[in-house]
Amino acid sequence: MALSKIDTAGLAADAVDNTILDLTSNYAFTGTITGAGGYTQGTKVSPTSGTTVDFTGIPNNVKVIHILFDLVERTSSAWGIIQLGDSGGFETTGYTSSVGYPGTGNTYTANAAADTNGLKFWYYGATKHSGIATIMRFSTDQTQWIMSSRCHAADSQSYSCYSAVERTLSADLTQIRITMASGAYSSTGGDINILYTS
């Protein structure tokens, strides 16, 4: 049978002032809460032209970063790419990567020369895409990062894309770039934003 009340006589005295805990009271707490602090959300960007979107000023204690895409479109078909950057600029080569997507004959590409310039997250142009890329710190400092992404076509084309990448930087990660091999962001817009946590 379910209990409908708590027998306060069975509660142990607390460790503060040796009084019995009163469940009807409103307690005030003081001090500083430490540990995981939740996510910080960036400022949403809605690109309608140009080739790059940059998120800068990433704090030096970040461990996990999410990049969110909603109905983003480009003018032509070519790889959309995510690149990491530190105080010396953006890293445009040296990524160990693989990407799988159902292109012609269910194409699968793994660590080809053309795939060392960043995380590939979608291919087709003139098609709206939505997805998420996750960037996680692998090392105790802020230099070694693992990235993965999942993206799908939101209209027209019917396909999805999955990627994984590793990159070690020469200094702490401070910025992220979303760019493309060719073409530009479409005038139809769409939204890109970033979330990160320590």
Name the predicted role of every residue range.
Residues 1-44, 48:
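Fibrous stalk/shaft segments of extracellular and virion attachment machinery
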Residues 35-198:
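Surface-exposed molecular-recognition determinants
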